[in-house]
Amino acid sequence: VTRLIATDLDGTLLRDDKTLSARTVAALTAAEEAGIEVFFVTGRPARWMDVVRNHVQSHGTAICANGAVVTDLRTDGGLLAVRALERDAALHVVHTLREAAPGTSFAVEMTTGINYEPAYPPFHLDPGASVAVAEKLLHEDTPGAGAPVLKLLAHHTELAPDAFLDLARTTAGDRASITRSSPSALLEVSGLGVSKATTLAACCAERGIAPAEVVAFGDMPNDIEMLSWAGASFAMGNAHPDVVAAAKGRTAANEEDGVALVIERILAARAEGRAEAR
């Protein structure tokens, strides 16, 4: 029996225009009314959660930054847990990737916001960001740099995204967890062992929820461990091939309400007293 639904946001629950369809909102509401907890599990930092803040269940909990943060969206992003990336590990990855993939630029996502190198592309302009080389951004004596590091971001302008990920994991994967969720060659580096899956597993253990009672949804490599861990899991119709291989099932694309389709099926089966259609 499903007790918890864990869903990624971008490319999964959200449409391409970063909104939730009316059908998806209705499915989320119906799940809560049926006693199923829904967790948003995303690579986004907590400060980018406004898009779903009005749709979080009464528990308020969301997992952000690929598992580095558990936040309470009811308290305007209050942090319930932080799994930081140690600075020496981050610096090791910086130095390793600079050597292995010249031209790599970096950004540092902290609990206080993002800072980045001059060469790092401004995916989202942040007027409060500090701009300096990564070593300075990671130096605790730099003003504002003493906060916990949630993610190191690494961008390359020429390498193919999967090739960049493979290179980074081969050269630096012994010191940090490295994944990606962007269509560009943008890598997300977390503390060793930190992932959506490990943080979700901890949250479920606190609630006495077993993996077999969890249904998970995702579309990109940073979802793979979570989809493998959950008892039932679905790759979106628009998912990366590696995600399709890792998931136990497949649903429609994010533009076609793929998450809502499965939730509706689960609830319909439950209402009829049948085994859930997973």
Specify the residue positions occupied by each region the protein language model found:
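Active-site glycine-centered loops adjacent to acidic/histidine catalytic or metal-binding residues
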Residues: 8, 42, 219
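Residue-level signal for inorganic ion chemistry
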Residues: 11, 31, 42, 66, ...
